[in-house]
Amino acid sequence: DNAIIYDDSVSGDELARLEAFSQDLIAALISIGVPPCPGGIMAKNPEWRRSLSGWRQELTRWLSATTPDNVMTGSMFMDLRPLYGRTDLVDALRTHAFHYMANEQGFLVRMAQNMTNFAPPLGWFGRIKVEKSGPNRGQIDVKKAGIFAITDGVKALAIEAGRLQGSTHDRMEALVDAGVLK
């Protein structure tokens, strides 16, 4: 997944260059074996290439209308990390999200509810359950069976504590330092 955030003052010519760059970037990633995102979450798509104010509006929409898709997309967006350019734009979006969620807990509540949709793959007497049919027959979906609940649980706690930077491990350490986790 990738996106572009640009300053609100970017000119039309600069926007055209950003669009061309984003097309070239995705083509280059594909050429070295990085598969395109099946959900289309790529900077070459205009909805994933916005100004700071455009991203603020979209983020507010995700946080306020807590449909399953908005919660999934908003949660994923909280993992945003700058790879190049002005990190203050990412910081501004995080600050916007924190301020919004400090006053409106609906998104965090829905995020926590979503975690209950992914139960551990245990059956009777603690036996491991595997997929019964389809292309993954006999296998466990590790992402859905455990990793998702851990990463999103830590993410929800990190959002509430205002310590969202870094990986899941970094967030866990920050939560321990803040006394949220022991």
Where do the PLM segments sit?
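Extended, hydrophobic alpha-helical segments in both membrane/secreted and soluble proteins
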Residues: 1-6, 22-25
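Short, glycine- and charge-enriched coil/turn segments that flank and shape catalytic ligand pockets
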Residues: 8-16, 178-181
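Conserved nucleotidyltransferase catalytic core and NTase-mimicking acidic/glycine-rich helix/loop elements
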Residues: 85-182
